[in-house]
Amino acid sequence: MSDSLRIIFAGTPDFAARHLDALLTSGHNVVGVFTQPDRPAGRGKKLMPSPVKVLAEEKGLPVFQPVSLRPQENQQLVADLHADVMVVVAYGLILPKAVLDMPRLGCINVHGSLLPRWRGAAPIQRSLWAGDAETGVTIMQMDVGLDTGDMLYKLACPITAEDTSGSLYNKLAELGPQGLITTLKQLADGTAAPEAQNEALVTHAEKLSKEEARIDWSLSAVQLERCIRAFNPWPMSWLEIDGQPVKVWQASVIEDATQSLPGTILAATKQGIQVATGKGILNLLSLQPAGKKAMSAQDLLNSRREWFIPGNRLA
């Protein structure tokens, strides 16, 4: 490849590994891979390598796992690779300005939203939570701000009524590598056209928490159904019954008006468990009691009908 670039790749989860895999078949020269240190995982808390490390070692690439890139000796690891560009995908560490300035073409990042909408940690989840009609990926030039750099390339993706964060993650993991390879070609041949972000259109994708995922029946059924899809597969929307957390995997919206207080169980049938909300009715379709597998509302009613007596209120 005549316009082959020397690339440092920095990333950690599976989403990042899919981008590294695309780079390795693109004709560019990946000269080093940075990923987060091995972390304890599973019941035995055994140290586990990141998906990016697993792929990099499988391909015989040099792997670096600093806890931080602030120390001078760790920055020197980057400098010694003499890269044309550093590609950053869900790395999880802050890149100091000294590192951002090292590669000839700077550092670029693959972000899971159509910037400037949803800067921050949870862009995929927040696009669902807000009811956006579309999302996508943005390849941007990195600067010292949080997702504030100039945009180099964007690819859009429609959000369907069935999408969860899990399904949208997979869609963007397919789109991202396409955009990345196109952007690298433009950088290599000098045709990249950076575009500044419109600050008037900025929204922030705050991190998710388990407490936020607790179902608040005062919200509308439409908003709660969005939350259930946005928080799937993590942290999972949940409610509490008899002191036990019950996860909600799937629900639908019934637009009918109700005079019942939010959280009131209106009906419990094989078609679902219908609960009054701040506006409309939420029909619970798939739930998971603590220590059990996810099951249909009908199966849960067969074993725990006393949990869902019409007229009772859910907390």
UniProtKB/Swiss-Prot annotation:
It catalyses: L-methionyl-tRNA(fMet) + (6R)-10-formyltetrahydrofolate = N-formyl-L-methionyl-tRNA(fMet) + (6S)-5,6,7,8-tetrahydrofolate + H(+). InterPro entries: Fmt (IPR005794), Formyl_trans_C (IPR005793), Formyl_trans_C_sf (IPR037022), Formyl_transf_N (IPR002376), Formyl_transf_N_sf (IPR036477), Formyl_transferase-like_C_sf (IPR011034), GART_AS (IPR001555), Met-tRNA-FMT_C (IPR044135). It is an enzyme of class 2 (transferase). (6S)-5,6,7,8-tetrahydrofolate binds at S113, L114, L115, P116. GO terms for cellular component: cytosol. Keywords: Protein biosynthesis, Transferase. GO terms for molecular function: methionyl-tRNA formyltransferase activity. Its EC number is 2.1.2.9. Attaches a formyl group to the free amino group of methionyl-tRNA(fMet). The formyl group appears to play a dual role in the initiator identity of N-formylmethionyl-tRNA by promoting its recognition by IF2 and preventing the misappropriation of this tRNA by the elongation apparatus. Belongs to the Fmt family. This is Methionyl-tRNA formyltransferase. It comes from Salmonella enteritidis PT4 (strain P125109). The lineage of its organism: Bacteria, Pseudomonadati, Pseudomonadota, Gammaproteobacteria, Enterobacterales.
